[in-house]
């Protein structure tokens, strides 16, 4: 299988608007021990679980859900904080702030395709189309991510 890297998506943490870290503009990931953590996709390998594993952190899980909107709503209700991908931080608008984490953590976004000798002609055409399409629209994708960074 061939992995084709397209972009790195910065990782964030959703906190209630009145959370002390909002004034800092960044969330020190070790601060998680002082907060109630809402585990999104519990028991599964997720971007959040991989991020915590990379920092050797075991967050104090208070609530669990497999629904991103439920996690967002719990954060908005002041029940805790949760991690979120940069491309997803503006799905809903409420009393929640998405803060970049420190140290920063990025999630690679790309496509996986069979090796050149094993890829079907249709899959090869789609791969080629997707790569051209992404390259032509990469600026727009970056604008969306950078716009998220400002919110």
Locations of regions flagged by a protein language model:
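Beta-alpha-beta core module
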Residues: 1-10, 24-25, 70-118
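A local structural motif
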Residues: 53-62, 96
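Short secondary-structure boundary segments
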Residues: 17-18, 43, 85-88
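Residue-level recognition of the GNAT/N-acetyltransferase active site
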Residues: 16, 40, 114-115
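Secondary-structure junction motif
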Residues: 21, 28, 33-56, 119-127, ...
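Short beta-strand-to-loop elements that line the ligand-binding cleft
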Residues: 39, 58-67
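Short helices/loops that flank or line small-molecule/ion binding pockets
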Residues: 30-31, 53-55, 68-79
